[in-house]
Amino acid sequence: LQSSSAASDVYKRQGDNWSFQCCGPHPAGAPDSININMMGWQPDGSDDGGQYYYDLALAVNPYDANIIHVGGVNHWISYDNGLTFSCPAKWSEPHKKGYVHADIHDINYFGNDLWFACDGGIFYSDNSGDSIYKKQFGIAGTDFWGFGTGFVDGEIMLGGTYHNGTLLKDGNTYLNDWLCTDGGDNIRGFVNFGNPRIA
């Protein structure tokens, strides 16, 4: 995996030479169905740009070198030694079984266990990424940038977080007390002073 201000590329060694495999505008040209951009936001690799300077991870299954994981904004998997890659779930599709939160900083195998570190916490797979599970429950790791609460009724709170969306609390109404109303970053939340049921 190579990253610079001009390129984000994946290289594969075949024999004595290294050859460009995929990702981004340099040196293989604009992204398309064959030259996918794994550092971008789209799950088909069709967009130009990305966050390779911020999210850059690579892991190879220690028991099967055909299984390669690349992390950028999204998680990508190859089952054919890097010949092709697919994105099992876009960064904004948490309902899918292969979902990993956006902005993947590290991917590591420990035996058969596969771990991901990303802006959304820690994710885990016991089957090389076919199913991925959130492992951050019970960890107080969300950084609130700002939030609002009802002036009369303190049961309603709306807060903006760093990389974990906008979170709403309404007493004990939601699972784990909070509901994510929007993804990404938000620096604040507002609750109507006149009607605390409007946030």
Where in the sequence are the language-model features?
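Signature of short aromatic-glycine-proline-rich micro-motifs recurring in repeat-based ectodomains
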Residues: M38-A59, H101-N108, D185-N186
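Structural WD40 beta-propeller signal
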Residues: N61-Y63, F110, G150, N192
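Surface-exposed loop and turn segments in beta-propeller and other repeat-based domains
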Residues: S19-G49, A89-G98
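Short coil/turn segments that connect the beta-strands within blades of beta-propeller domains
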Residues: A65-N66, N112, G154-E155, N195-R197
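Conserved beta-strand element within WD40/beta-propeller blades
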Residues: I68-G71, W115-A117, M157-G160, A199
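Surface loop/turn motifs at the tips and blade-to-blade linkers of beta-strand repeat domains
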Residues: D48-G49, K97-G98, Q136-I139, C180-G183
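Single conserved hydrophobic/aromatic residue that forms the stacking wall/gate
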Residues: L1-A7, Y11
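Short loop/turn segments that connect beta-strands within beta-propeller blades
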Residues: R13-D16, D80-L83, D126-D130, G171-Y174
